C-alpha cells in the first residue's frame, strides 16, 4: 500500500450517491432483498456479501440508495451552515446583501487578505432592505423551526420550502464563494434525487427480547426503515426531513432524548471509532488468575495447558518452513490450513477426508497449538505505564493459572490474591519480531525516567539476601549446594572456607566498582538490605551491573540471585512466629500500663483546664489552639510508644540476635517501629483527611460517650493495641476511616484515569527529533531532550558535591557553582538539592588507583574541559547550557576525592560519547513516556493518601492529586494562594492585620442589652487577652464595631463610647435607635452582631506567620518569615510597603506580571511539589508538560487544543463527532503526522525506539557549521587586531 501523506475531507456529491446501483424500495421482504437489510449491502453474521462474495473480514460493505422523488432534504448537521449563508443573501432575489450595488467583475482571487476583509465588511453589512432595484424587498430572517421541522420566516413563522433555499444557494456564483467562506458547491448540503443507505457493517444486529420472543435488529436499521417507508409513501418534505433528522441527530429537534442515532454512535467515549477502529475485541486472547512460579525466569511466562491447547499460532509456508509444516501435518498437529490460491480456510479434524485442498505453496499458512518459547504479550490492568504490558517467552506450566516470575510483580503492581492478567498471541510475524525486542523484559529493565531497574526481589527473597550476606564459615559443598545449578562454574581459588560475601562476588561476576558499595566486584558495604536487591532503587546491584555492561547482565543477575535466594531459604529455612513478635507478655503489659497511665494524666489535665474555664479562673484558648495542644499531648504518647519499641528492638537484638522478625526489619522488608506500635502498643489517633472525626448529633461521634464529651477517645484515639483487641467503639472508629478510604479509592481511580487520558492525549505527539531536541509537529519545545540528549533510562541521579576549599580546582568549581546554583535552591528557598543529574552512571567505571599511577591533575582538568567544550559545540550546538555536566565531572572526579588512571578517565569519556551517539534515537516518544510516568505516579499517590502542608488553622495548601489537577486545568478567575516571604516580620504583620478575618464573636465578648427611655444600650465587654491573642489592638476592635454599625441600614441613630473596665477588660458601649419596626430590627441586629462586626477578608482560615531557615547558598542560610494568603489579584497588595518582601504569586498572576516563560517555570515547580518528597526525578516530565502547556503566548489547559490545533481524526478519535463534519464542510486538507491519523491510514507513526538508524537534514547542519565557523573566524580576527593594537 502506498504511504498516504495527506488527507482531504469533503461532502458527498449527489452524483456519487446516485452512482450506486443497489436500490432500496421495500420496507419488509421475505428474503430482505430491496430492504435496508439487503444482503447486497455487505457481509453479515457469517453470510457472504451478495455484491462482492467476500466474508465479513474482507468486505467493507456497499452503499445503497432510496429515491426521494425530487424532494430537497437538508443534511441535518448543516442546518446552521444554511442559516449562516441565508443571512448573507436576499431570499427574494438571491443577490448578496450589501450597503451599495456591487459588480460581478471583481476577481477575488487576486485580492490580498486585507483587501478581501475590507470588501467583506462593505458588502456583507447589515441593511434593512435589498439594494437590487428590481427587488427592493425587506431582508427576511430565516430560522429552523424544531416544531414544524422546516425552515420558517422568523417574522411571520411561514414555511420556506427547501427547494427555494436550494435554488437560491446554488445560484451564488463561484467567484463569491471566498467572500462567504463557501468551500464547495452548496448543493452538497442537500439530498435531492436519492438518499444514501449505509452498508450493514456500521449497524450490526443487536439481540433483545420482547414478549418472550427474541428479536434481532439495530436502531439505525429501524430508523432507515422509517425513511424508506416515508419515501415510498411520497410523504411531505417535513415528514421525510424529520425521519432523516431522527436518523442523523435527534438532538437537533428534541432535547430530552438519548435514542441511538448516527450522532450518538460517533460521539462520546463509546463512539464507534474508538470501539471498532482504534481498539477492538481480538481473538487469540486469554485471561486467567495469576500465580507465582519459582521455575520460570523474569523473561518467561507460564501458560496452563487449557490456554496452550486453545490458542493457535500461524506458520507461513516458505522454502525454510515447508519441511517443518509437512512434519506437523504428518503428526496431526495442524488445526487449520489456509490455501491462498483458493482463498479457503480448512479446519483439519481427525478422520476428516481432505481432497485437493492442501498444496503447501508459498503464502499458504497453517495454524498449530501455541508452542513453548513463542513470544506472547501479557499484562495486568490498569495499564498505567509500559511495564504493565510486556512480551515474554511461553513456558508450559501445571495447574490452571497463568504463572509469572515474582521478579516482575512490582512493575505490574500485581499480587497473588486473585489478580487476573490477559494475554494476546499476535499473528503477524513482523509484530512478533517487534514485540520480542521492544517489549521484552530485558529491554525494559531500566525505568524510562528514574533509571533504576523495574524488576527485583520481593518479600522473603529480601530477607534471604540479608541473611546470605551475613553467613560465615561455609565449606565448598555448602556453597555449591546454595548455588545449585549455577555452581558449576564456581572457582574456590584454593580457599576452604567461604562467606556470603564470596557468593555475592561470584553472582556479580564483574570487576565493578562503586564508591562505598563495590570494589572489584566485591561488596564492601556492612550489610545487604532491600536497597541492593529490590526494584526501583538506585543502589540495586542489577542496575549497577547493567550500567557497567548491559541490561542482559542486569537481568541475569536478577534471575541468578532470585534462584540462589530461594535455594538458601529452602535449605536454611525462614519463618516468623507470634513468639518472635511477642516472646512474652511482659513488654506489652508494661506498654499497656504506661499508655493507660499517660492517657489518664492527659484526660485529667484536660478536665482541669475545662473546669477552670467554666469557673472563669482562666481565659479559654481558641478552638484551633485547644485542639492543637490536645493533639500534641496525644502525639507525645504515640512517640513514647515508638521510643519504647525502638529500645525494645535494640535490646532484643542484643539478647536474641537471631530473632527473625528483627532480621526482617534490618533487611528493610516489613515491620518498622510504627507498625509494631499498632500491634503491641496503641492503635493511635484515627483520622479522616488528616483530621480527627467531626462531632455530629449532640456534639459526639458515637453514642458510647456523653453528649458534648471532650474525651480524646471519643474523637477517635484508640488506646488498645491490635494484640489486645479493639472494643466496640474503637472498632467503629477504625471502620469510619476504612469507609472514607474505600470511597476515596473508588472516586479517585475515576478522576485520575480521566486526567491521565487527557495528559496522554495532549503529549502523545511530542517526540525527539534527529538533533536530540523535543518537538511536537514542527514546533520546538525543548533544545535538549532529558537535558543531556541521552536516553532517560541511562541518566543517573548522583550526589551534588558542593564547592570546598580542600578541593583541587576550587576556584573553577566555585565559579561554575555560582553560575548554576539558582537551580539547586528551590521551593521558596526552603530546600537545597542533594542530588543532580549525571548524563550516565560513570561512577561504576571509577577505579581508584595510587598517587604514582594516577593521571596528572592538569591533564585530567584539560581532558574534562576539552570534552565538555567539544560536546557543547558538536552535540548541543552551543544553544543549551551544559555547565551542570562539567560541574559533575569536576567534583566527582576531583583528585582531592579520588585518584584515577589515565585509562579510567579515557574509558569514562569514551562511554560518555557512546551514550550521546547511540542511546537517544530520533523519534523516541518522549511525550507518551513522560505522560505515563506522571499519570502512574499521581494515580498511586491519590490512592495511597492525601498529604497537605500541616499548619494549624492556615490555608491548607492542597498537595497531591487535587492540586495537580487544578494546575493542569488552569482555571481562570479563581483565588490563588499567594506566598509572602521576608526577613522583616513587621512587613508581613501589616498585611496579616488587614487580610486576616477576625470577627467580634472570636473575642468571646460578654454582650448585654438594656433599654433606656429613648434608646437601646449595648455593652460589649472584651477580655484584652483575646485581643492580644488575635494579634490586633483595641482600636481595631472599636473600628470593627463602628464600621458595622455605620453601614447598617436598620440603625437610625447611634453613638459609641469606650471605657477601660479594669486591667483585664475593655467595654464598648453602643447607643442605638432603630428604624421601624424597632423590635424586629433590634432582634436582627443582636443576632448578627458577633459575626458581622469583623475585619479582613471573609475566610475560615487564619493567616499565621511561620519562620523557617532559607538558603541563599549551600553554606549560607538566614531566618525567613513566611505567610500564605488567598487573593484574587495581586493589586490587593498594592497599598502595602513590600520592599524586600518576596511575593510568590499563583500561575495566572505570574503570567500576567512576568510572562509566559515565568509561568512555565512556576507550573513545572508547582506540579513537582504536588508529588511530595522523594520524587525529584519527575522534574523532567513536569518540565516537559509545563513547556507544552506554555508553548504559545498564553498558558493552555490540558483540556484544550487552541494552539497547535489537533488533527480532525484525533478529535474524532477522542469523541468529537463534529470534527469530521466541520472538516468536510470546510474541505480541510491535513498531513498524516500524528498518532491518531497514522492509525487510520496504516502509516507507521513518526516515532522510533533508539535502536534503528535515523536520518537528519545534513544540509541544515552544514549551514549551521559554516555560520559558526564564520562567526569564530571573524571573532579571532577581531581578537588579533585588538592584540596588534595593544
UniProtKB/Swiss-Prot annotation:
Q: Which domain of life is it from?
A: Viruses
Which controlled-vocabulary keywords does the entry list?
DNA-directed RNA polymerase, Nucleotidyltransferase, Transcription, Transferase, Virion
Q: Where is this protein primarily located?
A: virion
Looking at the UniProt record for this protein, which Gene Ontology cellular component terms does it annotate, in alphabetical order? Answer: DNA-directed RNA polymerase complex; virion component
Q: What does the record give as the reaction this protein catalyses?
A: RNA(n) + a ribonucleoside 5'-triphosphate = RNA(n+1) + diphosphate
Q: Where in the cell is it found?
A: Virion
Q: Does the keyword DNA repair apply?
A: no
Gene Ontology MF: a single term: DNA binding
List, alphabetically, the Gene3D superfamilies matched.
1.10.132.30, 2.40.40.20, 6.10.250.2940, RNA polymerase ii, RNA polymerase II, clamp domain
**What SMART domains is this protein classified in?**
RPOLA_N
- EC code(s) of this entry: 2.7.7.6
What interactions and quaternary structure are annotated? The DNA-dependent RNA polymerase used for intermediate and late genes expression consists of eight subunits Rpo30/OPG66, Rpo7/OPG90, Rpo22/OPG103, Rpo147/OPG105, Rpo18/OPG119, Rpo19/OPG131, Rpo132/OPG151 and Rpo35/OPG156. The same holoenzyme, with the addition of the transcription-specificity factor OPG109, is used for early gene expression.
User: What biological function has been recorded for the protein in this entry?
Assistant: Part of the DNA-dependent RNA polymerase which catalyzes the transcription of viral DNA into RNA using the four ribonucleoside triphosphates as substrates. Responsible for the transcription of early, intermediate and late genes. DNA-dependent RNA polymerase associates with the early transcription factor (ETF), itself composed of OPG118 and OPG133, thereby allowing the early genes transcription. Late transcription, and probably also intermediate transcription, require newly synthesized RNA polymerase.
What the record says about family reads: Belongs to the poxviridae DNA-directed RNA polymerase 147 kDa subunit family.
According to UniProt, the name of this protein is DNA-directed RNA polymerase 147 kDa polypeptide
Gene for this chain: OPG105
Amino acid at each position: 500500500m502506498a504511504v498516504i501523506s495527506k488527507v482531504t475531507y469533503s461532502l458527498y456529491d449527489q452524483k456519487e450517491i446516485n452512482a450506486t446501483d443497489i436500490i432500496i424500495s421495500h420496507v419488509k421482504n421475505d428474503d430482505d432483498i430491496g430492504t435496508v437489510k439487503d444482503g447486497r449491502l455487505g457481509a453479515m453474521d457469517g453470510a457472504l456479501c451478495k455484491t462482492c462474495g467476500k466474508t465479513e473480514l474482507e468486505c467493507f460493505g456497499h452503499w445503497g440508495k432510496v429515491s426521494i422523488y425530487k424532494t430537497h432534504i437538508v443534511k441535518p448537521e448543516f442546518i446552521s451552515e444554511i442559516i449562516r449563508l441565508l443571512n448573507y443573501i436576499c431570499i427574494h432575489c438571491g443577490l448578496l446583501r450589501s450597503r451599495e450595488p456591487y459588480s460581478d467583475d471583481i476577481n477575488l482571487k487576486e485580492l490580498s487578505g486585507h483587501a478581501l476583509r475590507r470588501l467583506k465588511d462593505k458588502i456583507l453589512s447589515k441593511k434593512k432592505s435589498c439594494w437590487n432595484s428590481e427587488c427592493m424587498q425587506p431582508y427576511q430572517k430565516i430560522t429552523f423551526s424544531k416544531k414544524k421541522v422546516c425552515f420558517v420566516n422568523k417574522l411571520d413563522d411561514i414555511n420556506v420550502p427547501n427547494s427555494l433555499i436550494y435554488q437560491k444557494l446554488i445560484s451564488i456564483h463561484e467567484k463569491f464563494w471566498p467572500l462567504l467562506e463557501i468551500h464547495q458547491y452548496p448543493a452538497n448540503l442537500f439530498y435531492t434525487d436519492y438518499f444514501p443507505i449505509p452498508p450493514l457493517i456500521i449497524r450490526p444486529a443487536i439481540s433483545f427480547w420482547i414478549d418472550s420472543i427474541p428479536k434481532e435488529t439495530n436502531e439505525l436499521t429501524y430508523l432507515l426503515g422509517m425513511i424508506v417507508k416515508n419515501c415510498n409513501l411520497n410523504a411531505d418534505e417535513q415528514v421525510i426531513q424529520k425521519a432523516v433528522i431522527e436518523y442523523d441527530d435527534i438532538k437537533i429537534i428534541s432535547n430530552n432524548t438519548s435514542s441511538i442515532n448516527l450522532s450518538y454512535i460517533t460521539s462520546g467515549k463509546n463512539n464507534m471509532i474508538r470501539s471498532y477502529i482504534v481498539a477492538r475485541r481480538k481473538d487469540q486472547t486469554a485471561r486467567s488468575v495469576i500465580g507465582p512460579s519459582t521455575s520460570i525466569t523474569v523473561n518467561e511466562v507460564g501458560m496452563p495447558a487449557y490456554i496452550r491447547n486453545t490458542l493457535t499460532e500461524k506458520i507461513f509456508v516458505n522454502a525454510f518452513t515447508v519441511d517443518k509444516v509437512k512434519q506437523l501435518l504428518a503428526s496431526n498437529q495442524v488445526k487449520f490450513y489456509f490455501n491462498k490460491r483458493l482463498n479457503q480456510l480448512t479446519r483439519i479434524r481427525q478422520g476428516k477426508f481432505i481432497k485437493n485442498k492442501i498444496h503447501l505453496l508459498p503464502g499458504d499458512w497453517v495454524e498449530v497449538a501455541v508452542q513453548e518459547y513463542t513470544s506472547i504479550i501479557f499484562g495486568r490492568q490498569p495499564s498505567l505505564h509500559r511495564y504493565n504490558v510486556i512480551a515474554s517467552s511461553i513456558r508450559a506450566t501445571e495447574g490452571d493459572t497463568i504463572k509469572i516470575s515474582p521478579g516482575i510483580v512490582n512493575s505490574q503492581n500485581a499480587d497473588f490474591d486473585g489478580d487476573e492478567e490477559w494475554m494476546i498471541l499476535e499473528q503477524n510475524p513482523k509484530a512478533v519480531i517487534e514485540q520480542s525486542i521492544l517489549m521484552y523484559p530485558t529491554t525494559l529493565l531500566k525505568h524510562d525516567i528514574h533509571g533504576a531497574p523495574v524488576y527485583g526481589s520481593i518479600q522473603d527473597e529480601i530477607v534471604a539476601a540479608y541473611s546470605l550476606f551475613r553467613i560465615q564459615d561455609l565449606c565448598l559443598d555448602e556453597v555449591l549446594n546454595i548455588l545449585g545449578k549455577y555452581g558449576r562454574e564456581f572457582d574456590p581459588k584454593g580457599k576452604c572456607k567461604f562467606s556470603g560475601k564470596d557468593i555475592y562476588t561470584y553472582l556479580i561476576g564483574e570487576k565493578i566498582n562503586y564508591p562505598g558499595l563495590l570494589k572489584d566486584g566485591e561488596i564492601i558495604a556492612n550489610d545487604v538490605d532491600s536497597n541492593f536487591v529490590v526494584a526501583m532503587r538506585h543502589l540495586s546491584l542489577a542496575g549497577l551491573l547493567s550500567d557497567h555492561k548491559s541490561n542482559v547482565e542486569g537481568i541475569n543477575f536478577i534471575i541468578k540471585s532470585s534462584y540462589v535466594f530461594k535455594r538458601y531459604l529452602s535449605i536454611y529455612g525462614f519463618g516468623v512466629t507470634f513468639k518472635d513478635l511477642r516472646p512474652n507478655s511482659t513488654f506489652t503489659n508494661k506498654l499497656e500500663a504506661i499508655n493507660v497511665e499517660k492517657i489518664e494524666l492527659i484526660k485529667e489535665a484536660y478536665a482541669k483546664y475545662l473546669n477552670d474555664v467554666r469557673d472563669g479562673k482562666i481565659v479559654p484558648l481558641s478552638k484551633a489552639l485547644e485542639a492543637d495542644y490536645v493533639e500534641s499531648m496525644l502525639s507525645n504518647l504515640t512517640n513514647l510508644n515508638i521510643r519504647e519499641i525502638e529500645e525494645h528492638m535494640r535490646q532484643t537484638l542484643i539478647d536474641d540476635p537471631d530473632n527473625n522478625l528483627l532480621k526482617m526489619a534490618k533487611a528493610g522488608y516489613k515491620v518498622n517501629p510504627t507498625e509494631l506500635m499498632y500491634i503491641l502498643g496503641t492503635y493511635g489517633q484515627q483520622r479522616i483527611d488528616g483530621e480527627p472525626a467531626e462531632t455530629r448529633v449532640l456534639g459526639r461521634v458515637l453514642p458510647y460517650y456523653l453528649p458534648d464529651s471532650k474525651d480524646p477517645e471519643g474523637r477517635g484515639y484508640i488506646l488498645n493495641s491490635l494484640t489486645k483487641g479493639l472494643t466496640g467503639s474503637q472498632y467503629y472508629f477504625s471502620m469510619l476511616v476504612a469507609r472514607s478510604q474505600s470511597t476515596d479509592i473508588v472516586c479517585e481511580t475515576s478522576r485520575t484515569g480521566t486526567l491521565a487520558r487527557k495528559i496522554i492525549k495532549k503529549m502523545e505527539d511530542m517526540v525527539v527529533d534527529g538533533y536530540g531536541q523535543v518537538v511536537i509537529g514542527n514546533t520546538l519545545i525543548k533544545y535538549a531532550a532529558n537535558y543531556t540528549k541521552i536516553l532517560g533510562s541511562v541518566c543517573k541521579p548522583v550526589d551534588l558535591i558542593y564547592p570546598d576549599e580542600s578541593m583541587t580546582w576550587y576556584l573553577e568549581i566555585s565559579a561554575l557553582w555560582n553560575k548554576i546554583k539558582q537551580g539547586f535552591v528551590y521551593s521558596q528557598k526552603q530546600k537545597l538539592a542533594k542530588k543532580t543529574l549525571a548524563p550516565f552512571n560513570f561512577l561504576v567505571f571509577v577505579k581508584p588507583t595510587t598517587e604514582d599511577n594516577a593521571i596528572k591533575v592538569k591533564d585530567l582538568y584539560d581532558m574534562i574541559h576539552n570534552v565538555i567544550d567539544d560536546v557543547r559545540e558538536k552535540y548541543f550546538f552551543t544553544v543549551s547550557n551544559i555547565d551542570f555536566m562539567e560541574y559533575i565531572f569536576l567534583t566527582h572526579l576531583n583528585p582531592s576525592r579520588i585518584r584515577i588512571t589515565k585509562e579510567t578517565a579515557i574509558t569514562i569519556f569514551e562511554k560518555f560519547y557512546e551514550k550521546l551517539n547511540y542511546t537517544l534515537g530520533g523519534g523516541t516518544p518522549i511525550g507518551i513516556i513522560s505522560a505515563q510516568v506522571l499519570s502512574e505516579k499521581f494515580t498511586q499517590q491519590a490512592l495511597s493518601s492525601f498529604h497537605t502542608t500541616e499548619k494549624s488553622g492556615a490555608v491548607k495548601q492542597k498537595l497531591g492529586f487535587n492540586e495537580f489537577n487544578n494546575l493542569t486545568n488552569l482555571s481562570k478567575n479563581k483565588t490563588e494562594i499567594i506566598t509572602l516571604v521576608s526577613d522583616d516580620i513587621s512587613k508581613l504583620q501589616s498585611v496579616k492585620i488587614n487580610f486576616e478575618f477576625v470577627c467580634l464573636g472570636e473575642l468571646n465578648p460578654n454582650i448585654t442589652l438594656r433599654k433606656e427611655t429613648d434608646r437601646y444600650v449595648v455593652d460589649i465587654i472584651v477580655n484584652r487577652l483575646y485581643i492580644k491573642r488575635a494579634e490586633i489592638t483595641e482600636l481595631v476592635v472599636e473600628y470593627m464595631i463602628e464600621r458595622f454599625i455605620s453601614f447598617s441600614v436598620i440603625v437610625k441613630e447611634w453613638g459609641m463610647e469606650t471605657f477601660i473596665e479594669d486591667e483585664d477588660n475593655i467595654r464598648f458601649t453602643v447607643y442605638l435607635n432603630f428604624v421601624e419596626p424597632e423590635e424586629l430590627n433590634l432582634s436582627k441586629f443582636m443576632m448578627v452582631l458577633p459575626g458581622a462586626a469583623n475585619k479582613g477578608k471573609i475566610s475560615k482560615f487564619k493567616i499565621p506567620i511561620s519562620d523557617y531557615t532559607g538558603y541563599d547558598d549551600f553554606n549560607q542560610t538566614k531566618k525567613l518569615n513566611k505567610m500564605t494568603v488567598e487573593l484574587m489579584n495581586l493589586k490587593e497588595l498594592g497599598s502595602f510597603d513590600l520592599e524586600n518582601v518576596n511575593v510568590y504569586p499563583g500561575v495566572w498572576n505570574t503570567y500576567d506580571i512576568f510572562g509566559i516563560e515565568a509561568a512555565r517555570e512556576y507550573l513545572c515547580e508547582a506540579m513537582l511539589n504536588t508529588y511530595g518528597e522523594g520524587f525529584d526525578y519527575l522534574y523532567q516530565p513536569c518540565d516537559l508538560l509545563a513547556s507544552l502547556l506554555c508553548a504559545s503566548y498564553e498558558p493552555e489547559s490540558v483540556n484544550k487544543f487552541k494552539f497547535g490545533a489537533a488533527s480532525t481524526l484525533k478529535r474524532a478519535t477522542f469523541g468529537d463527532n463534529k470534527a469530521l463534519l466541520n472538516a468536510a464542510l470546510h474541505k480541510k486538507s491535513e498531513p498524516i503526522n500524528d498518532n491518531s491519523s497514522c492509525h487510520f491510514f496504516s502509516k507507521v507513526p513518526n516515532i522510533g525506539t533508539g535502536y534503528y538508524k535515523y536520518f537528519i537534514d545534513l544540509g541544515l547542519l552544514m549551514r549551521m557549521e559554516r555560520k559558526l565557523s564564520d562567526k569564530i573566524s571573524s571573532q579571532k580576527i577581531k581578537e588579533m587586531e585588538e592584540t596588534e593594537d595593544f
